[in-house]
UniProtKB/Swiss-Prot annotation:
Belongs to the MoaC family. The gene is moaC. It catalyses: (8S)-3',8-cyclo-7,8-dihydroguanosine 5'-triphosphate = cyclic pyranopterin phosphate + diphosphate. Keywords: Lyase, Molybdenum cofactor biosynthesis. This is Cyclic pyranopterin monophosphate synthase. CDD domains: MoaC_PE (cd01420). Pathway: Cofactor biosynthesis; molybdopterin biosynthesis. The lineage of its organism: Bacteria, Pseudomonadati, Pseudomonadota, Gammaproteobacteria, Pseudomonadales. GO terms for molecular function: cyclic pyranopterin monophosphate synthase activity. Substrate binds at residues 73-75, 110-111. It comes from the Bacteria. InterPro entries: MoaC, MoaC_bact/euk, MoaC_sf, MoCo_biosynth_MoaA/MoaC, Mopterin_CF_biosynth-C_dom. It comes from Pseudomonas syringae pv. syringae (strain B728a). Its EC number is 4.6.1.17.
């Protein structure tokens, strides 16, 4: 069942008024593939625009907080934790993981996915002058905890909470 559609098939925001406040958490990831020389420039701190990872981290945090402004049917949430981690993966990629938490009536999957996506876009923006062939890939939800639908772990069967 698509929860964002009413009985006539019109888009609407889900009413969470009567849902219990519970602890909720989500973790998402994204990868940015690039030339090895581009990754080396980022890791060594040699980028003329500054610390690429620091800027991407802040962009991801800001994006999580702005998710409801970007995705029309997302509820505005009072997130209590946002963490964005960036690390070199092999010699040609950056792996981004983003986690979001709150005590609330709806999940934080979209906030975590938005954080990872915007951090990846920020890396692309900062490095496009030296590597226009970068690829943002594998944006996905890794884990979701809390709420009625239970515990989800990517690549595993759904686990109830």
């Amino acid at each position: 069942m698509l929860t964002h559609l009413d009985s006539q098939g019109r888009a609407n925001m889900v009413d969470v008024t009567d849902k219990a406040v519970t602890s909720r958490e989500a973790v998402a990831e994204a990868f940015v593939r690039m030339l090895p020389t581009t990754l080396q420039m980022i890791v060594s701190g040699g980028h003329p625009k500054g610390d690429v990872f620091a800027v991407a981290r802040i962009a991801g945090i800001q994006a999580a907080k702005k998710t409801s402004d970007l995705i029309p049917l997302c509820h505005p949430l009072m997130l209590t934790s946002i963490k964005v981690h960036l690390a070199a993966e092999g010699d040609d990629a950056v792996r981004i993981t983003a986690s979001c938490k709150l005590a609330g009536q709806t999940g934080v999957e979209m906030e975590a996915l938005t954080a990872a996506s915007v951090a990846a876009l920020t890396i692309y923006d900062m490095c496009k002058a030296v590597d226009r062939g970068m690829v943002i890939e594998s944006v996905r939800l890794l884990e979701k905890l809390g709420g009625k639908s239970g515990h989800f772990i990517a690549d595993q069967a759904q686990v109830s909470s």
